[in-house]
């Protein structure tokens, strides 16, 4: 088996060196048509993507599942060591949902507009939402990660055929039709953890009166028959990756750990990778909603819809000890924990000779802060381990 694995890696490298960077399905088809109907990855119950991802020292898989080869010499021992590592996230996700998955490939023909122009936004909403009488839209946001609370950078909206990325970071008010959509009770806004997006929009854009009729897909999923066959904590939110796997049979790479997630969303010109990353959530959210409705024969969602409005801070009861509002207390607790994370890293670096430091399980916000902080220290690297909801970060010291 080991020789077969080494040969497969070498053959894939030779194929890429001959053709240049190549899509996964082309490589897979070539080997199955010209070498063996059951190549080594199939024998081991892996997709070619999962197989290639076991060897990150030799291969890079791009956004469009295009595989390129790192120009470094082959080392047989390294290949076998990589092969014997714990199974990758793709295989783990398949185990979690109990079925085979297909790697999500971003559609090349998807209609996407990126703009900060008020008139373009208003026209797009009029033409693609109101004129077409859209009753459901996908909604998501992205924000620059800096270790502190930041204003939303972009808002993503998706309909069945069209998508828009609205660059709002430099806006103090929002386009008229965008406010109209948020307030419109006839349009359901679907997303994952959409309450977080709604609250942050209200926090930074006071011209938004209310955001009405939002639907968290995690709540909808819990109302279906899916949950009879899987273990779900009713108090826990289900992420997009697991929802897409259960409902669409698609595997989405760990977006929370992506370098694109950490990129500058306030740039006036977004890269193509940023555009694809950003629109994936709103686009797939709408797909998941539509598929769930087909599977459940139009499940009634009225009791799951939520409205969000501005809270008048002057009317919020103050904490008697510190004279702080609830929001201010939450902010202070967040800042306290961020400082605690940094302090633990510094203390370990200064007082401990061990090569690794393992944090307890934490949510994506705090994991991102660990990664961002570690990037500033040349001799350290960090990696997220585990599966939701028990993901944690390991920091490694490089001597």
UniProtKB/Swiss-Prot annotation:
InterPro entries named among the record's database cross-references: 3'-5'_exonuclease_dom, 3-5_Exonuclease_domain, R3H_dom, R3H_dom_sf, RNaseH-like_sf, RNaseH_sf
Keyword annotations of the record: Exonuclease, Hydrolase, Nuclease
Domain annotation 3'-5' exonuclease: ranges: 118-297
UniProt GO molecular function: 3'-5' exonuclease activity; nucleic acid binding
Record-level GO BP terms: nucleobase-containing compound metabolic process
UniProt domain R3H: residue ranges: 335-399
PROSITE patterns: R3H
Name of the protein in question: Putative 3'-5' exonuclease R431
Species of the source: Acanthamoeba polyphaga mimivirus
């Amino acid at each position: 088996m080991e020789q077969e694995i080494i040969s497969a890696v070498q053959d894939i490298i030779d194929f890429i060196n001959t053709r240049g960077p190549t899509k996964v399905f082309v490589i897979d088809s070539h080997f199955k048509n010209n070498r063996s109907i059951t190549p080594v990855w199939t024998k081991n119950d892996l997709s070619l993507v999962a197989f290639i991802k076991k060897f990150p020292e030799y291969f890079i898989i791009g956004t469009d599942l295009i595989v390129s080869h790192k120009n470094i010499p082959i080392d047989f021992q390294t290949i076998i060591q990589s092969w014997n590592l714990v199974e990758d996230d793709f295989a783990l996700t398949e185990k979690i949902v109990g079925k085979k998955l297909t790697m999500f490939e971003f559609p090349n023909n998807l209609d996407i507009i990126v703009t900060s122009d008020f008139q373009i936004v208003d026209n797009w909403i009029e033409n693609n939402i109101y004129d077409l009488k859209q009753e459901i839209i996908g909604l998501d946001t992205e924000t620059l990660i800096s270790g502190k609370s930041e204003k939303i950078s972009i808002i993503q909206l998706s309909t069945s055929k069209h998508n828009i990325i609205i660059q709002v970071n430099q806006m103090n008010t929002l386009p008229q039709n965008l406010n109209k959509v948020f307030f419109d009770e006839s349009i359901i806004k679907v997303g994952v953890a959409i309450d977080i997006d709604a609250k942050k929009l209200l926090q930074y854009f006071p011209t938004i009166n209310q955001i009405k009729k939002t639907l968290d897909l995690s709540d909808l999923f819990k109302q279906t028959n899916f949950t009879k066959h899987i273990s779900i904590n009713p108090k826990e939110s289900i992420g997009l990756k697991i929802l897409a796997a259960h409902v669409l049979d698609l595997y989405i790479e760990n977006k929370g750990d992506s370098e694109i997630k950490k990129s500058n969303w306030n740039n006036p010109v977004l890269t193509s990778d940023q555009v694809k990353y950003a629109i994936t959530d709103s686009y797939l959210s709408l797909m998941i909603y539509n598929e769930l409705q087909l599977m459940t024969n139009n499940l009634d969602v009225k009791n799951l819809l939520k409205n969000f409005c501005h809270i008048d801070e002057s009317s919020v009861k103050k904490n008697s000890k510190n004279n702080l509002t609830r929001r201010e207390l939450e902010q202070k607790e967040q800042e306290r924990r961020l400082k605690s994370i940094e302090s633990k890293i510094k203390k370990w670096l200064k007082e401990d000779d061990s090569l690794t430091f393992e944090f307890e399980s934490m949510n994506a916000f705090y994991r991102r802060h660990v990664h961002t902080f570690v990037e500033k220290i040349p001799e350290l690297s960090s990696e997220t381990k585990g599966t939701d909801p028990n993901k944690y970060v390991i920091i490694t010291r490089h001597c």
